[in-house]
Amino acid sequence: MEINNRCQKKYISIKTEFLKICLVCFILISNKFQKFEEKKNNPKRKLKVGVIGLDHHKNIGNNILKYAMSVQLKELGVDPYIIGYNTGKGIKFIAEKTNLVSINNFDQLNQTDYDILMVNSDQTWRFWNRRFEDIAFLKFAENWTIPKFVYGASIGTSHWSFSNKTNYLAKKLLKNFTGISVREMGTIKYVKQYLNMSAIYVLDPSMLIDKAYYLDAIKDYKKIINKTDYILTYKLDYIYNMEKFINITKKKLKFYIYDIQLNDEEYIEKFLSGIYNCKAVITNSYHGVLFSIIFNKPFVAFKNINRGNERFNTIKEVYGIKDRFFDMHKNPSLDLLFTPLRFNNKIINYYRNISIEYLKKNLNIL
């Protein structure tokens, strides 16, 4: 009797183990079948990349960067989501041309919605930014396990403005990032000095894509200025020498002076069209200079010490343009407005390749 009981218990134990094995096999087969079905229904599921940047608001550089990065990431075969706080102003362009995600709080974002997070370029590392730690170092995603990296962060000035507390937090949060890159050459040494980390230089996102994308973006824009020949002026701030030069240009040249005002919903189209169709550009804007280069327009740029000159210094170094930047005490020659723009395409292409390879590496698509 005792032997029978032992045999019966052993039989039940073996049967239980067998059923467990069958259950595990069933689950494994079911999972494989489910993944097979998912792949069959969606064989080319794209990598979902959350692109964190400054607030969605009316700003030329901010919005063009978002557009350009979205285009570049799509060219690399991933699915970008342009994430930012929604101010409800001036976002028509990027709302129409990107996968825009407008939020009111970073807590609205879920790790399961994205495969990778990246900090986009522009002044995302400028210390006065609202929601600075969440934008600059992705603090809201501190415990997320997906890969994170920084593309082309700018500190916006010629000096490092992080406090000791912020330096400590940056080190803590950035240590698990797969890559750190900056938009100005001079920032590399600050990252090493204050964060003890390595960073590389990459191009502003607007320089990554072909100008054909910008021309396509304005192909339906109808409000082109009704002047055959004009010189475009684009001012961020009042600079005495710049105003003086503009007035001299008005008096001595026969060209119409078009002082572009970005005060309507189509301000990005107006900006792109204005530079593309002009004879020359007078500006104190970083992106005013970059788009003069993109559209190959002669330009004169005035430095603004309050905004920092590191961005212009980097352009001079990388693009090989030395003679078109002027401080408050120097007066440019009018001849520059008619002197063809010369820049080093070989160097630009070199850094463009480095920038795109950096993206590929951190997106794990090499």
Predicted regions and their residues:
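Active-site anion-handling motifs in enzyme catalytic cores
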Residues: 2-366
